Amino acid sequence: MQVLRNSGSWLLLSWAGHGMTRFVGIAPAKNIHTGAPRLEDSAARQNTEREAAPSRFSLYPPVPGQESSLQWAGMKFEDVPIAHIKATYNNTQIQVVSATNASLARASCGTEGFRNAKKGTGIAAQTAGIAAAAKATGKGVTHIRVVVKGMGPGRWSAIKGLTMGGLEVISITDNTPVPHNGCRPRKARRL
């Protein structure tokens, strides 16, 4: 009987033809025995219900203050601790703060034993990231948001170090200051 009903819905679709606009879509099997006006009403009602229901999933993290059902370790997005990474050409500094801006962990390439030109390398930034992650996980941090500032060579290495240290990164934000033709830049290096 079900096969007969499904073939009936196909017949109704083919009956509508190419030029006719009476039939909106494929009718469910239970609506075949109803009249054409009622069939159009039910199809229109289903379309408006689909359009009216908003999708709860978003590819982007929620805006602060916006309601969201997403949670990490039982915390809302606004309550997840933040790792601030300042990547300069000479050093990389990492500070992990709570949602209330209380410092949880701090590390830099200089505090990890790298000196002079070695502080500005990716290996030093990765080591500083691992050290900051170890200090933060000791205080119970499991998930983290990352805010990166600067264009140094340790940008991505520091994030990799945080993940290698056991923290799960849920968002990465680039907060590098960009002048809109502000101060005159420093002179170009002559090699």
Swiss-Prot record:
GO molecular function: structural constituent of ribosome
GO cellular component term of the entry, any: mitochondrial small ribosomal subunit
Coiled coil: none
Region (Disordered): 37-62
Pfam families: Ribosomal_S11
UniProt keywords, alphabetically: Mitochondrion, Ribonucleoprotein, Ribosomal protein, Transit peptide
Sequence ranges of Basic and acidic residues compositional bias: 38-53
UniProt entry tagged with the keyword Ribonucleoprotein: yes
Any one GO biological process: mitochondrial translation
Localization, UniProt: Mitochondrion
Complex formation: Component of the mitochondrial ribosome small subunit (28S) which comprises a 12S rRNA and about 30 distinct proteins.
HAMAP family: Ribosomal_uS11
Family designation: Belongs to the universal ribosomal protein uS11 family.
Name the UniProt record assigns to this protein: Small ribosomal subunit protein uS11m
Organism: Mus musculus (Mouse)
Gene from which this protein is expressed: Mrps11
